[in-house]
From Swiss-Prot:
<dbReference type="InterPro" id="IPR015870">
    <property type="entry name" value="UDP-acyl_N-AcGlcN_deAcase_N"/>
</dbReference>
<keyword id="KW-0443">Lipid metabolism</keyword>
<comment type="function">
    <text>Catalyzes the hydrolysis of UDP-3-O-myristoyl-N-acetylglucosamine to form UDP-3-O-myristoylglucosamine and acetate, the committed step in lipid A biosynthesis.</text>
</comment>
<feature type="binding site">
    <location>
        <position position="238"/>
    </location>
    <ligand>
        <name>Zn(2+)</name>
    </ligand>
</feature>
<protein>
    <recommendedName>
        <fullName>UDP-3-O-acyl-N-acetylglucosamine deacetylase</fullName>
        <ecNumber>3.5.1.108</ecNumber>
    </recommendedName>
</protein>
<dbReference type="GO" id="GO:0009245">
    <property type="term" value="P:lipid A biosynthetic process"/>
</dbReference>
<comment type="pathway">
    <text>Glycolipid biosynthesis; lipid IV(A) biosynthesis; lipid IV(A) from (3R)-3-hydroxytetradecanoyl-[acyl-carrier-protein] and UDP-N-acetyl-alpha-D-glucosamine: step 2/6.</text>
</comment>
<dbReference type="InterPro" id="IPR011334">
    <property type="entry name" value="UDP-acyl_GlcNac_deAcase_C"/>
</dbReference>
<dbReference type="Pfam" id="PF03331">
    <property type="entry name" value="LpxC"/>
</dbReference>
<dbReference type="GO" id="GO:0016020">
    <property type="term" value="C:membrane"/>
</dbReference>
<feature type="active site" description="Proton donor">
    <location>
        <position position="265"/>
    </location>
</feature>
<comment type="similarity">
    <text>Belongs to the LpxC family.</text>
</comment>
<dbReference type="InterPro" id="IPR020568">
    <property type="entry name" value="Ribosomal_Su5_D2-typ_SF"/>
</dbReference>
<feature type="binding site">
    <location>
        <position position="242"/>
    </location>
    <ligand>
        <name>Zn(2+)</name>
    </ligand>
</feature>
<keyword id="KW-0378">Hydrolase</keyword>
<dbReference type="GO" id="GO:0046872">
    <property type="term" value="F:metal ion binding"/>
</dbReference>
<dbReference type="InterPro" id="IPR004463">
    <property type="entry name" value="UDP-acyl_GlcNac_deAcase"/>
</dbReference>
Length: 297
């Protein structure tokens, strides 16, 4: 059978919170089968656990945030979530001594490296996939996102920026998921922001950890980072990375096709909630043999 995954050993790193600008220590711990993904705030006494599921997703305006019934929050989980989805990690305990996951370089790549350094352990329990049975679509004005039945996992994403630094030919990307392809082609794509917006956010106490080391920064004409872009279409690739992380808030890798136009955290989360609210639209699937699995990890 295709088995659930956790880590082989504990690993730790430090970084800075994107919005708080404060140092954060992140510790990843292995755990048992069917535990799921648990975030633990160790800066609180006693420590507070937040179980990842679609109901625990709170604010999605600037990032994806988890919140429990007592108002305890953890911000900016989407890049770490994407790394877990990309490597198929089902069970993990994520400890933070702050209310925010560190932004690192603005991509999921540092988290992928951390997870691979920990090693992946298979558990003696069947891995459950969320498989689409019906097409579900959500819209917000001209923006929309859709999940369709498909025997595999693909993403088809289009952004629409009228900006000299974002060429019209680089605003669409199609991605056929495999773990190796995710690591090489999606995980390295960084978040991006416009200089004018960053200054406004920082004046209001947000994006205090934003810098050229943690994002692609754009003025009205060009990319300001000295090292430029990692991919010609890095902007849309990062939007796909965000979507992979947001869709993993259900705690399962998806089997289906995701198509979106100008979608973001809010619409991605709305789509996932809409799917899960319709019992006829999805099912949990397990696989006895690797040859039957339509995804490659």
């Amino acid at each position: 059978m295709i088995k659930q995954r956790t880590l082989k050993r504990v690993v730790q790193t430090t970084g800075v919170g994107l919005h708080t600008g404060k140092k954060v220590t992140l510790t990843l711990r292995p755990t048992s089968a069917n535990t799921g993904i648990i975030y633990r705030r160790t800066d609180l006494y006693p420590p507070v656990d937040l179980q990842v599921n679609v109901k625990s997703v709170g604010n999605t305006v600037l990032c994806t945030c988890l919140i429990n019934e007592y108002g305890v929050q953890i911000f900016t989980v989407e890049h770490l979530s994407a790394a877990q989805a990309g490597l198929g990690i089902d069970n993990i305990i994520i400890e933070l001594n702050a209310p925010e996951v560190p932004i690192m370089d603005g991509s999921a790549s540092p988290f992928v490296c951390l997870l691979l350094d920990a090693g992946i352990e298979e558990l003696n329990s069947a891995k459950k996939f969320l498989r689409l049975k019906q097409t579900v679509r959500v819209e917000d004005g001209e923006k929309w996102a859709e999940l369709r039945p498909f025997n595999g996992f693909t993403l088809d994403f289009t952004i629409d920026f009228n900006h000299p630094a974002i060429n019209v030919d680089t605003q669409h990307c199609f991605f056929n998921f495999s773990s190796a392809s995710f690591v090489h082609n999606i995980s390295r794509a960084r978040t991006f922001g416009f200089m004018r917006d960053i200054k406004d956010l920082q004046s209001r106490g947000f994006a205090l950890g934003g810098s050229f080391n943690s994002a692609i920064i754009i003025d009205d004409y060009r990319v300001l980072n000295e090292d430029g872009l990692r991919f010609d279409d890095e902007f849309v690739r990062h939007k796909m990375l965000d979507a992979i992380g947001d869709l993993f808030m259900c705690g399962h890798n998806l089997i289906g096709s995701f198509i979106a136009f100008k979608s973001g955290h809010t619409l991605n989360n709305k789509l996932l909630k809409t799917v899960l609210s319709c019992q006829e639209a999805w099912e949990l699937a397990t696989f006895s043999n690797a040859s039957d699995l339509p995804l490659v990890f």
